[in-house]
Amino acid sequence: MASYFNLTLDTLAPTISAFTINSGASVTTSTTVTLSITSTDAAAMKIWGINGVASEADASWETFSSSKSVTLTSGDGSKTVYVKVRDSVYNESAASSATITLSTAIPTITITGPDVNIISEQSGKNICTFSFSSSMALKAWKVKLVPANNSAHDAGTQIGTTGGSTNMTGTTLAASTSKECKIYGSDLSTAAGGADGTYIIKVFGQASVNSLWSA
C-alpha cells in the first residue's frame, strides 16, 4: 500500500464571463424570461431578484445550467436579476447582474368623430372624417373594417387609399397627439366587397415601447 496521497488545494473562485436576459433584449412583454450564463468551473448557481426570491438570502444553490427559465416579479418596470456561481469545493464568484424592462401595457385608442355616419360614392357626400389619439407613443397604426367591436388587430380588412382615403396606416405617432383620417366611399366599398351596409371601423395602434397592439 502507498504511504502517500495527492491533495489539491483550490482557492480560485469561478468567474461569470457573460450573463444576459433573453439574449440581451432591453424589453420583454412576458414575466417568463430565459437567463443565459457563461462561466468556467461552475458546479452550482443561485439566482435572485425574481418572483419568490427577492434577495440572496432567499436564494438556494442549484446545479449549474447555462440556460435557465425564470419568472420576473410582477408589475411593469425595470427588473434586475442576480446570479452567483460556485465550484465543487464551494469557492464562490462575485454576483453578476442583468437588467430588462417588463412592459405589458397596450395603447388605448380614442376616436373623436366621425363627422358623418353615412357616406356614398357621390362627390360632396363621399368622405367621412375623424381623428384619433393614443395613450402611448405608437410605432404603427392602421384603420380597418372589422367584424366585431372587440376584434383584434389581425382581424378584418385594411381600408385602402386608392380612392383618396388618408392616414389609413402610418408610423410614429406621439402619445396624446391627434391624427386626422378621411375615409372615402370608394375605399370603404372596396374593403366591404362592394356591398352596402353598416360597418364597424376600428383603429389599432402598436406601442413603440413593446410592439403590443391595442385591443
Please report, for each region that a protein language model flagged, where it lies by residue:
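Low-complexity, disordered linker/stalk regions enriched in Pro/Thr/Ser/Gly
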Residues: 1-215
